Amino acid sequence: MKNVVSILRRDLGAYFTSPIGYIFMMVFVTISVGLYITMFFSFPRADMRPYFDNLPLLLCVFIPAVTMRIWAEERKENTWEMLLTFPMRAAELVIGKFLAAFIFFALTLLATITVPAMLYSLGNPDTGAILGGYFGTLLLGAFFLALGIFFSGFCKDQIVAFVVTLLTCFMFFLIGTDFIASYIDDKFAGLGT
């Protein structure tokens, strides 16, 4: 457990010691909130469903950007061999890196708290739906993070890791759409619903 915490601190600190982490947070919050605000003024209701409808597609792009450097950066900075010589299991290393990326993602998602705050000032939105939407987004983000860390471990280049993770996340996004589900249901009854 001590090894997991040390890797967690090291990697989480790396997100916030460079401006890249802050830029990522600002861009994600700006795009996600901006898309919601434009929809909100088109259909003025105290509802966050349009916000959560857009998030999976945004996560398909932003999560690979977070995970592409996780293992590739270790190889580039020649710290890969040093990490392997530490007295820790590979699972501890992976869990520490995953938790660091997940906490960074959760903090980024927490920065979007302005959206429900705005809704509560304008009306009476459903708190359960908002909490459920954020919880579902955290789970989807954790899944995409796991995919990104997996593919980053196989790729030596950050860009290749980004593209492979992006395409895989997008494939899973498409599988969840109504169009693909109805197509699967036509071919194999009951599987798409």
Model-identified regions with their sequence ranges:
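Aromatic- and glycine-rich beta-strand/loop motifs that create alpha-glucan
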Residues: 1-21
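Transmembrane helix-loop junction
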Residues: 10, 14, 73, 85, ...
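Hydrophobic alpha-helical transmembrane segments of multi-pass membrane transport/permease proteins
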Residues: 19-38, 54-63, 167-171
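Secretory targeting signals
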Residues: 35-37, 48, 58, 100-160, ...
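Terminal transmembrane helical anchor/hairpin motif
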Residues: 45, 164-193
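Long, hydrophobic alpha-helical segments
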Residues: 53-73, 108
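Helix-loop-helix units of permease transmembrane domains in multi-pass membrane transporters
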Residues: 70-100
